[in-house]
């Protein structure tokens, strides 16, 4: 998620942590690095310079807080101002009536339909029953896409691909849903902001649906253009909140987030990948903590809680955090990571690990995961608990037993060693020094 921006800001914080003195010159060096990183992420130039001016002013004029050194104080200011840049923490989506009606809006290509399915999954995790009313008459595949995405969730989709009257579809869909479901999501046709007829239809739909919440889905790859998009929709209907989609790997995601924050539209959720599970409630403090390489243990614990139930799973989470795990632990880890999301994203939640995990460590496809499981099934319990004993003769035996090659065994061992090495620095060492002190200070 925002890999380039995260890497740049993490390096800036490390540079700051390593400074022996903080004066106007060193402060200017730091703010120039921040300016470069944010502008490359398509954050508005005027906004960027305003932010770095605040950082410099506060760093030079504020009284040093008790218990913090000058550089720790500057790091704290950088963190706080970046949090302010992307807005306040929004209120949670409160389902306070039945049915609670949500109208989903967005431009064509924003990822609105997929995001609707993601929101349904999120609501299901919270214990709410949902149904979807599809009123998208412009894209023939919309109804079928929704049906396929939500079928595993056992969520009904009401619609009719043959009916080209969105208002009629909304009325009939709402009538069929009645009050059987906690939440009814109305998926609308993707708009172009210039298409007046569609915007008029959206306003009419809003009158028919009488939504409790109107959610606008904005594509995170469009950068600061998100501002004008949100403003156009806001003029047509009341926007209750915003979901920024496609933040995984987007070079302009920072620009999109800050642009939306400028017009004070609350960002409630963000989409962080292609899977239905790649979706999370937006929390500016947690988000910036991850961007700066400070981790986000709260989100890690929440994600783990969603996919773990047995004691052994919880013990394995401790292994991940401590960096002490065997091949058997790694087998369980990969299973859990596969449920929680891409390993690179999960590792960014662990304080101090941030960008340390090599890029190739995240490229564990389902196919490779299957191969690794076959290889581990060919190992003895002793080998799984003591991977260091696996040398040439054992490699030969394991590969033969699995029907795979020696290179496959070596690939597994290489992945294990890379991951173990990356996790070795976890624990107390990652919470030491200025960065660690700042993390502890932020957790108070």
From Swiss-Prot:
<dbReference type="InterPro" id="IPR013822">
    <property type="entry name" value="Signal_recog_particl_SRP54_hlx"/>
</dbReference>
<dbReference type="GO" id="GO:0008312">
    <property type="term" value="F:7S RNA binding"/>
</dbReference>
<keyword id="KW-0378">Hydrolase</keyword>
<dbReference type="InterPro" id="IPR003593">
    <property type="entry name" value="AAA+_ATPase"/>
</dbReference>
<dbReference type="Pfam" id="PF00448">
    <property type="entry name" value="SRP54"/>
</dbReference>
<feature type="binding site">
    <location>
        <begin position="187"/>
        <end position="191"/>
    </location>
    <ligand>
        <name>GTP</name>
    </ligand>
</feature>
<dbReference type="GO" id="GO:0048500">
    <property type="term" value="C:signal recognition particle"/>
</dbReference>
<dbReference type="InterPro" id="IPR000897">
    <property type="entry name" value="SRP54_GTPase_dom"/>
</dbReference>
<feature type="binding site">
    <location>
        <begin position="106"/>
        <end position="113"/>
    </location>
    <ligand>
        <name>GTP</name>
    </ligand>
</feature>
<keyword id="KW-0733">Signal recognition particle</keyword>
<dbReference type="Pfam" id="PF02881">
    <property type="entry name" value="SRP54_N"/>
</dbReference>
<dbReference type="InterPro" id="IPR036891">
    <property type="entry name" value="Signal_recog_part_SRP54_M_sf"/>
</dbReference>
<dbReference type="GO" id="GO:0005525">
    <property type="term" value="F:GTP binding"/>
</dbReference>
<protein>
    <recommendedName>
        <fullName>Signal recognition particle 54 kDa protein</fullName>
        <ecNumber>3.6.5.4</ecNumber>
    </recommendedName>
</protein>
<dbReference type="InterPro" id="IPR042101">
    <property type="entry name" value="SRP54_N_sf"/>
</dbReference>
<dbReference type="GO" id="GO:0003924">
    <property type="term" value="F:GTPase activity"/>
</dbReference>
<keyword id="KW-0342">GTP-binding</keyword>
<dbReference type="InterPro" id="IPR036225">
    <property type="entry name" value="SRP/SRP_N"/>
</dbReference>
<dbReference type="GO" id="GO:0016887">
    <property type="term" value="F:ATP hydrolysis activity"/>
</dbReference>
<comment type="function">
    <text>Involved in targeting and insertion of nascent membrane proteins into the cytoplasmic membrane. Binds to the hydrophobic signal sequence of the ribosome-nascent chain (RNC) as it emerges from the ribosomes. The SRP-RNC complex is then targeted to the cytoplasmic membrane where it interacts with the SRP receptor FtsY.</text>
</comment>
<dbReference type="InterPro" id="IPR004125">
    <property type="entry name" value="Signal_recog_particle_SRP54_M"/>
</dbReference>
<comment type="similarity">
    <text>Belongs to the GTP-binding SRP family. SRP54 subfamily.</text>
</comment>
<dbReference type="InterPro" id="IPR027417">
    <property type="entry name" value="P-loop_NTPase"/>
</dbReference>
<keyword id="KW-0547">Nucleotide-binding</keyword>
<dbReference type="GO" id="GO:0006614">
    <property type="term" value="P:SRP-dependent cotranslational protein targeting to membrane"/>
</dbReference>
<keyword id="KW-0963">Cytoplasm</keyword>
<comment type="subunit">
    <text>Part of the signal recognition particle protein translocation system, which is composed of SRP and FtsY. Archaeal SRP consists of a 7S RNA molecule of 300 nucleotides and two protein subunits: SRP54 and SRP19.</text>
</comment>
<dbReference type="Pfam" id="PF02978">
    <property type="entry name" value="SRP_SPB"/>
</dbReference>
<dbReference type="InterPro" id="IPR022941">
    <property type="entry name" value="SRP54"/>
</dbReference>
<keyword id="KW-0694">RNA-binding</keyword>
<keyword id="KW-0687">Ribonucleoprotein</keyword>
<feature type="binding site">
    <location>
        <begin position="245"/>
        <end position="248"/>
    </location>
    <ligand>
        <name>GTP</name>
    </ligand>
</feature>
């Amino acid at each position: 998620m925002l890999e380039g921006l995260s890497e740049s800001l993490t390096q800036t914080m490390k540079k700051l942590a390593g400074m022996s003195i903080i004066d106007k010159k060193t402060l200017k060096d730091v703010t120039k690095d921040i300016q470069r990183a944010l502008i490359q992420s398509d954050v508005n130039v005027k906004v960027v310079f305003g932010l770095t001016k605040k950082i410099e002013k506060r760093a030079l004029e504020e009284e040093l807080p008790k218990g913090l050194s000058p550089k720790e104080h500057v790091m704290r200011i950088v963190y706080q101002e970046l949090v302010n840049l992307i807005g306040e923490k929004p209120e949670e989506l409160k389902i306070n009536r039945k049915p609670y009606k949500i109208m989903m809006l967005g431009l064509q290509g924003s990822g609105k339909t997929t995001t609707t399915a993601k929101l349904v999954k999120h609501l299901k995790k919270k214990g709410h029953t949902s149904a979807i009313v599809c009123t998208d008459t412009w894209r023939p595949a919309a109804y079928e896409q929704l049906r396929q995405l939500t079928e595993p969730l056992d969520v009904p989709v009401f619609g009719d691909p043959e009916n080209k009257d969105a208002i009629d579809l909304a009325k009939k869909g709402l009538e069929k849903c009645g009050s059987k479901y906690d939440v009814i999501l109305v998926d609308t046709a993707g708009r172009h902001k210039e298409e007046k007829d569609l915007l008029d239809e959206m306003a009419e739909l809003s009158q028919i649906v009488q939504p409790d919440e109107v959610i606008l889905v904005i594509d995170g790859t469009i950068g600061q253009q998100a501002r004008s998009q949100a403003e156009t929709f806001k003029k047509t209907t009341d926007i209750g909140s915003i979901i920024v989609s496609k933040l995984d790997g987007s070079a302009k995601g920072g620009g999109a987030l800050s642009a939306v924050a400028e017009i004070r539209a609350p960002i409630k959720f963000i989409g962080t990948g292609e899977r239905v599970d790649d979706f999370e409630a937006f929390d500016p403090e947690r988000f910036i903590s991850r961007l700066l390489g400070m981790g986000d243990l709260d989100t890690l614990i929440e994600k783990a809680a969603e996919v773990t139930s047995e004691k052994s799973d919880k013990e394995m989470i401790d292994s991940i955090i401590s960096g002490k795990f065997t091949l058997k632990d790694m087998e369980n880890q990969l299973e859990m990571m596969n449920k929680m999301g891409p390993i690179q994203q999960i590792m960014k939640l662990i304080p101090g690990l941030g960008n340390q995990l090599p890029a190739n460590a995240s490229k564990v496809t389902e196919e490779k995961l299957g191969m690794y499981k076959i290889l581990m099934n060919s190992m003895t319990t002793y080998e799984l608990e003591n991977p260091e004993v696996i040398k040439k003769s054992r490699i030969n035996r394991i590969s033969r037993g699995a029907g795979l090659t020696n290179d496959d065994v070596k690939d597994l061992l290489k992945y294990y060693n890379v991951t173990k090495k990356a996790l070795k620095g976890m624990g107390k060492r990652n919470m030491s020094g200025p960065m660690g002190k700042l993390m502890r200070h932020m957790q108070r």
